[in-house]
Each structure stands twice: as structure tokens, then as C-alpha cells.
Design a protein with these regions (language model features):
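A generic tandem-repeat structural signature
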Residues: 59, 67-69, 73-79, 93-96, ...
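Ankyrin repeat domain, specifically the short helix-to-loop turn at the C-terminus of the second helix
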Residues: 19-26, 51-60, 86-94, 122-125
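Carbohydrate-active catalytic/glycan-binding domains of CAZyme proteins
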Residues: 127-611
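Conserved ankyrin/ankyrin-like repeat signature
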Residues: 16, 48-49, 82-83, 115-119
Length: 611
């Protein structure tokens, strides 16, 4: 039966195929095979055959293949206008919808050929060159908050225990972002000493008030009080930032709301609570809850907006994992009562198999022309886990005629989206970061690109680990460097690292001995650590390299002709049970022990699945 149907599809024999589908044997054919027939017809560009199969097989348009591709993906690979038009206009499929790797029908058409892309662009009304890809800020940059001043957009994100802390980014097109500063560069001022991995600065908010930029954030520490709300301001987003105040308000995820009358309020969870705030950032009263949430499960990240006489409250719910969503409520009065949006959740868990998941905790921003956008956190799936941590995405926010917000037309997070504004590209400038320490306190960058790193404690130590790292921004990465131990003492080591926190990391290092250097791979998972010697080299200098693809990494030292392939699920948010695991993986350089290591010929390459 299967071979018969496929031959009829190839031949384009509609009448015979229709009779064959009436055969009672057809009722016993598994649905997966029926779906396979439709995909086959779409890939061949047999529009009549596809239409017949869909008409006779209920539910087929909802099916996807093992890569998460739908019938429009398949039709795009054929380049046939009629087949693509049927999938778009009759089956209602989206040319911007991504598969399990974020690949869209427009991407497939582009690979098929220029004519196929031109045809699909004409049919869907969107040009691939006029689109951007989410996430727009890659590598762990969760809990985004945004403010527009004129035609400039500024964003701040959580940084946890990393220094410099609380990165400030700038954009003029909402897609290309440049890090222009940090609220904290000194770990002592930031009070990050002793903070466990996953603690530190959570969910900041940035706002603009009377000519100054304001940032508030929760400091989650291992001391008392366990949670305090940090507040500071600066004349420019680059700083200098005033000495921070730490407000004794429980809860997390603070934001500042300024009403039409100029009165200011600190907004925090549990649920959404508001506390009057002075112009100087001091508390003027006690917190008062105004709404608990839509599903009332782990509500956090509240942001208030005043529009058309309504107070709109945006709030994240469901926790930081795969149940994370964004909901909304509104009221004519600041203190309520608030009415839940009938479309809740307005962003989040629509497709459990989607490439971009864990979406929520965001903030709206209005463009100069009156349009709206919504920035939010998300997580890209890598082998069912979250390797790059929670990142920042942006989608259009539209308003219904009766005044309710809809993010991306309630379709969930987008992989590909039409640009808001003309491109304003910036030069990438990912800064080095270190847990709890300022990178400048133990490292020095030479003009030739080499880096000196003073040896420090083990990466499992809380306050003295010397590592220079970048956020892992893509699932495929290559990191290599020539490591020179001549100024390290015997027993000291230096090399490359993949790092999540003090309980989850690997080190590929040269360890100095009297006769030369050992090439060692160390892996820390929870409270346990393994060590494997991959080889030995004469002398105290050698090249090291790490290649990662998904959760599989390969460590190598060409001078020792040794390689080791290993799995590093411990670098994901889901890699260990317990603790505060919602930051993200980093890669970089580290030195352990007494003395100094020199890194030369440093090369770091991160590759998107689209490349």
C-alpha cells in the first residue's frame, strides 16, 4: 500500500490515488505513514496530491517530522509556488515558524534557490533580508528590562555573581546590541563576595526619570538579609553610577513605575506589590499587594505600564523552567482591582517541542512611531536542555480594539521576525567576566592580544578563582590558545574551561612539573571531581583546544597528540539537581596555583546552526 501511494504521488495520478485512499486497507495504515505521504507530496511540489491527502487525512496539517519541520518546510524545499501557496493560505502555516533548530520555511527556500525564496517571500509578504533572529542577545542574558530615550534603547540584564555586574546594552534598532557599561565593576561595592553560584544580582529594571537613569535589582546573598533591593542612578547609562542603596524590602525582581502625576513606586513580587518611592529612591511606605497573578504559581518579574487610562500589570509566572509564561492584568485604579487578560498567558508555553522555550519575564517598550515591542527571556533547546542559559528575545506587541495586549499575535516566541527599524549594526564587544572578582584584578591584556593571568584558587572556591570567561552564545564552539607556564610554579596549571558554577565545570590544562607539563582534563560535577591525564609534553608551553557541539565536547592538545571526547550535561540549567541553576554556561581561560600564565594565539569561535 505504501509503495503504491508513493508511486501515484510521483506520477501525479489524482484519480487513482483517490480510489486507493478509499481502500479499506487504508484505515489500518498508521498516521505517521499518512503524514509521510503528505510530506513526500509537498517535497515533490505535487500540490494536487498534497491537497487530496490533507482532505482525506484529518489532522495532518498539525503534524511535524522528526526535525520539527511542517508541511510548509517541505513545500519550500520543492520551490513550487502552488504547493507553498496551499500550505500558507489554506493550511494557515507560518513562513517564520522554526523547527527544532530554529530553521524556518524561508530559510529552507533560501537554500533551495533564489527563485524559491523569491516565490515564498512574495506569497507570505515578508523578505528574509527584512527579518531578524531571536534571541537578539545571546548567551545568558535573562530578565531583560528596557527603556527608550529619544531614538535610543537601553537594556539591563541579570548577571548573578559575574563581575562586572549588571550589563547595560544600547541599540538603535532593537536587534543589534552593544554593551556600553556595567552598574558595578567592583565586587566589594556590589557585595558579591561569598555569594553562591546562581545568587548575586537578579532581575534588574532600568528606567529614566528627571534626566537620570535608574537601575534597581535584587541582591540575593548568602547572608542576612537574604534578599535586598539595590537601587542606584546615573546621569548616563555608561555611568558613573551612584553608591548603591540597599532597600529592606522582601521579594525579588523590583521595577520602578512612575505614574502620570510624577509619583514613583517600587514594584516587587510576591505576586505584584507596590511601595511608594521618593525622588531620591527611598521608601515612603509599606508594600501592598495589588494582584497575585493569573495561575498564581511563582509569580515574579512585575512591570507596570500606564496606557489610555489603564494600569497594565505584566507578570511572569510558572517558575524559571519550561512552564515559564507571561501574563497580564489591568485596572482603572493603581491599587486595583485588576482584571486578568482573557488571552492569558500572553506569551509562553504554546509548543513544548519548540526551539525557543521558557519564555516570559519581560517588559514592553513603545517605539517613536507608536508601535510596541516586548523584550523577554527565553531558552533555546540543545538536546532537550538549556546550555546557553536564558537569553533575551523581542517580539511585536499589538493591542486589541478593546485594549488587551498580544505578544507576537499569541503565537509564542518567534525564531524569525520582521525587523522593527532599519538596521543599525554595532561592533560585537563581549566583555570578559569572572565570578565574584574583577577581571582587571588578576589579568592583563597585551597589545599583541596575549593575556597574562595570575594564578588563583580552584574554580570550586568561592572568592579566589581566576578565570576570564565569555558567555557561551551558540551551541557550537571552538576555543583554543597556546598556554605558557614558564612563570608558574611547579604544580600550577592553566588552560581552557567550560564553566557553569563552582559545582559544574571542566578544565583542560597544562600542569607544570619539573620535567615538563602534563595535559590534564578535570571535570567537576556536584561535589565530585574526576581527573584524567591525556598526555605529556616536554617543556612548559603547548597549544590546547576545546571543540563543543551541543553537549558533546572534545579536548585536545596537538603537541601531545591526545584527544578526549566527553559529555558535559552539567553545563546546562538542568545538569544538576538543587541549587539556583538558571544562569548559563561560559567558556574561557583559567589559571590555578602560584605564579602567572600567559595565553597566546587565543581563538574563540561560536557558530549558529544557521551558519
Amino acid at each position: 500500500m505504501e509503495g503504491t501511494v508513493e508511486r501515484l504521488i510521483e506520477a501525479g495520478d489524482r484519480e487513482t490515488l483517490a480510489r486507493a485512499l478509499h481502500d479499506r486497507k487504508y484505515a489500518d495504515v498508521p498516521g505517521s505513514i499518512k503524514t509521510g505521504w503528505a510530506f513526500y507530496a509537498a517535497k515533490l511540489g505535487k500540490a494536487d496530491m498534497l491537497r487530496l491527502l490533507v482532505e482525506r487525512c484529518h489532522g495532518m496539517p498539525l503534524e511535524k517530522d522528526a526535525q520539527g519541520k511542517n508541511l510548509l518546510h517541505a513545500a519550500a524545499s520543492s520551490g513550487d509556488r502552488e504547493t507553498m501557496a496551499f500550505a500558507l493560505r489554506v493550511l494557515g502555516m507560518d513562513a517564520l515558524a522554526g523547527d527544532l533548530q530554529g530553521i524556518t520555511p524561508l530559510d529552507i527556500a533560501a537554500k533551495t534557490g533564489e527563485e524559491a525564496l523569491k516565490t515564498l517571500e512574495e506569497l507570505c509578504g515578508v523578505r528574509l533580508s527584512d527579518c531578524y533572529r531571536n534571541p537578539v542577545l545571546r548567551g545568558f542574558r535573562p530578565d531583560p528590562s528596557i527603556v527608550r530615550v529619544g531614538e535610543d534603547y537601553y537594556m539591563v540584564n541579570s548577571s548573578f555573581v559575574m563581575v562586572p555586574a549588571l550589563p547595560i546594552s544600547h541599540s538603535r534598532d532593537l536587534v543589534h546590541w552593544e554593551t556600553i557599561g556595567h552598574v558595578f565593576t567592583d565586587p566589594d561595592t556590589a557585595r558579591l563576595r561569598g555569594a553562591m553560584g546562581g545568587f548575586g544580582y537578579w532581575a534588574p529594571d532600568i528606567s529614566y526619570y528627571k534626566g537620570r537613569f535608574w537601575v534597581v535589582a535584587t541582591l540575593r546573598s548568602s547572608t542576612v538579609p537574604a534578599r535586598a533591593q539595590m537601587i542606584t542612578s546615573a546621569p548616563t547609562p555608561q555611568g558613573p553610577w551612584d553608591a548603591p542603596k540597599f532597600l529592606d524590602v522582601d521579594g525579588i525582581d523590583p521595577s520602578i513605575f512612575t505614574d502620570d502625576d510624577g509619583k514613583r513606586y517600587l514594584v516587587t513580587n510576591i505576586g505584584a506589590q507596590i511601595t511608594p518611592l521618593s525622588d531620591a529612591g527611598d521608601l515612603l511606605g509599606e508594600p501592598r499587594m495589588i494582584w497575585y497573578g493569573w495561575n498564581r504559581i511563582k509569580s515574579e518579574g512585575p512591570h507596570l505600564l500606564k496606557k489610555d487610562g489603564w494600569y497594565y500589570l505584566f507578570i511572569a509566572e510558572g517558575g524559571t523552567g519550561f512552564s515559564h509564561v507571561e501574563s497580564c492584568a489591568r485596572s482603572r485604579s493603581l491599587y486595583g482591582p485588576y482584571e486578568s487578560c482573557p488571552f492569558n498567558p500572553i506569551l509562553g508555553k504554546r509548543d513544548e517541542e519548540a526551539y525557543i522555550r521558557r519564555s516570559g519575564h519581560g517588559k514592553p517598550v513603545q517605539l517613536p512611531d507608536g508601535r510596541w515591542a516586548f523584550v523577554y527571556l527565553c531558552g533555546r533547546r540543545v538536546e532537550e536542555k538549556t546550555l546557553m542559559g536564558r537569553e533575551t528575545a523581542i517580539d511585536p506587541l499589538d493591542w486589541t480594539p478593546d485594549g488587551w495586549p498580544m505578544i507576537n499575535r499569541l503565537k509564542g516566541p518567534s525564531c524569525l521576525q520582521k525587523k522593527f527599524l532599519s538596521d543599525a549594526p554595532v561592533k560585537p564587544n563581549e566583555p570578559w567576566v569572572c565570578p565574584r572578582l574583577s577581571p582587571e584584578s588578576f589579568s592583563f591584556l597585551e597589545t599583541d592580544g596575549s593575556v597574562w593571568v595570575q594564578g588563583g584558587a580552584e574554580l570550586s572556591e568561592m572568592d579566589a578563582a581566576h578565570a576570564l570567561m565569555h558567555r557561551l552564545r551558540e551551541a557550537s564552539v571552538t576555543l583554543e590558545a597556546t598556554v605558557d607556564l614558564r612563570q608558574m610554579e611547579s604544580g600550577g596549571m592553566a588552560g581552557l574551561t567550560g564553566y557553569y558554577d563552582e559545582h559544574s565545570y571542566f578544565l583542560l590544562v597544562l600542569r607544570k612539573t619539573v620535567l615538563g607539563s602534563d595535559v590534564v582534563l578535570r571535570q567537576r560535577v556536584g561535589d565530585g571531581e574526576t581527573e584524567e591525564t591525556l598526555g605529556r609534553v616536554s617543556g612548559w608551553e603547548a597549544a590546547l583546544r576545546v571543540d563543543g557541539h551541543g553537549l558533546t565536547f572534545t579536548a585536545s592538545c596537538p603537541d601531545a597528540k591526545e584527544t578526549k571526547t566527553f559529555r558535559a550535561e552539567y553545563l546546562t540549567d538542568e545538569g544538576l539537581q538543587g541549587g539556583k541553576r538558571f544562569s548559563g554556561a561560559l567558556v574561557g581561560l583559567a589559571a590555578v596555583g602560584a605564579g602567572q600564565a600567559v595565553f597566546r594565539n587565543i581563538r574563540e569561535e561560536m557558530r549558529d546552526v544557521q551558519d
